Amino acid sequence: MKTVSEQMELARKAQAIVNDYTQEQIDEICLAIGWEVYEDENIAKLAKMAVEETGYGNVQSKIIKHKRKVGGVLHDIKGAKSVGLIERNEETGISKYAKPVGVVCAILPATNPTATCGGKAVGILKGRNAVIFKPSSRALKSTTEAINMMRAGLRKVGAPEDLIQVLEDPSREAITELMKVSDLIVATGSGQVVRAAYSSGTPAYGVGQGNACAIVAEDADVAEAAKMICGSKLFDYATSCSSENAVIPVEAVYDQFMAEMKKNGCYLVTGEDREKLKNHMWKPNAKGKIALNPDIIAKSAQVIADGAGISIPEGTDILLVEGMEPILGDKFHDEKISPVLTVYKAKDFKDAYRILVELTNLVGRGHSCGIHTYKHEYIEFLGEHMKSSRITVRQSMSAGNGGHPFNRMPSTATLGCGTWGGNSTTENVHWRHFINVTWVNEPVAPWTFTDEDMWGDFWKKYGK
């Protein structure tokens, strides 16, 4: 087992080699490693390994996730300049040159280990960097297999395979050391992991907690909205932080919406069964704090129902509960990471917005929200007022937030939540976050202004 310092030495030597690579060579590297975690047989193997090892999600969804995430990053970087001169503006005299950030420490989640690893590797190497991955202990074998596949891709094109490594020492001391000696950290995982990254003294990109919530307005295509929401919630048994945790249909379409949800495999849990479900989903943890039961995370509706001791109809894919107010007093407002969805009936859009704000202020600040509407005034209102880093309109949130062919969001599995969520950016963290940019400025005709140009209108209103 290599030490952190030994692995870092290998990474720096590998990065020094590709530091002089051309754009064409770097793009070949990205295609080489991308193919290894996009090719059908490989990703079927990785998906099966990940589900067996972690117990999270399902194989078919993880195969699709590989295609979406790795394919999306490759699409985003195709033709993009990341080596040398990347921009030149004759009018301003500004030229921009891309430089590597160096060696990146990338911390991976158990819920989405191999596709996240593949997508991140492509984006990081696009900037001529090296990366050392720290997998979740629950996903070590599957993540290591994905990394070995990509290292084989590097060898195929004659690139140093130590551009991509897995941290060999699993101890807490090793990950702490790795974070301190790396040039940049990208942390996708729990709040504890993100806080550790930000506290390391190394520049870091982290994620905030998810609790994605969507409004269904009175003008929505209700059948299509229900279909999208159910597809999103069921996908990989809701491992995605963008999977809808609550939906807020307005009263005018509530009954129709619930009927459509039933058609899409949902079952409404009520009465004593609702209480049993809640008590199964949230239990005291080792510290005595009520927390999400790890046994329900990314499990099927049937497994969750069996654990709760409730009966559900055969073929049920998603468990619904109606939300209660006050919202804080009902645990179903929380992030669930499972095919369990809370439904809140709102009087109208204004009331739906109130519920949305309260939900995301409690859990998931800055992450995301969605709306199913064609009314631009509703979309603009959310854009102006909602403290969310991304607002997804008439789309599946688990697919749309992180980039998808049907929108132009940058492809990623790392969603910044801004200062609202305790993060350094609101952006989808993607390949452009893994380059340093040098600004070269040359003299041009000077800009000038008169006092009248600058303050004329102000003086007319307030005087000098």
Curated annotation (Swiss-Prot):
Source taxon at top rank: Bacteria
Catalytic activity: sulfoacetaldehyde + NADP(+) + CoA = sulfoacetyl-CoA + NADPH + H(+)
Name the record gives this protein: Sulfoacetaldehyde dehydrogenase (acylating)
InterPro entries: Ald_DH/histidinol_DH, Ald_DH_C, Ald_DH_N, Aldehyde_DH_dom
A GO molecular-function descriptor: oxidoreductase activity, acting on the aldehyde or oxo group of donors, NAD or NADP as acceptor
Activity response to pH changes: Optimum pH is 9.5.
Function, in words: Involved in the degradation of sulfoacetate. Catalyzes the conversion of sulfoacetyl-CoA and NADPH to sulfoacetaldehyde, CoA and NADP(+). A much lower level of activity (1%) is observed when NADP(+) is replaced with NAD(+).
Top class in the EC scheme: oxidoreductase
Induction: Induced in sulfoacetate-grown cells but not in thiosulfate-grown cells.
Record-linked CDD domains: ALDH_F20_ACDH
SUPFAM superfamilies: ALDH-like
Protein family according to the UniProt entry: Belongs to the aldehyde dehydrogenase family.
Gene3D superfamilies the record matches: Aldehyde Dehydrogenase, Chain A, domain 1, Aldehyde Dehydrogenase, Chain A, domain 2
Active site, renumbered: 241
Keywords, sorted A to Z: NADP, Oxidoreductase
EC number: 1.2.1.81
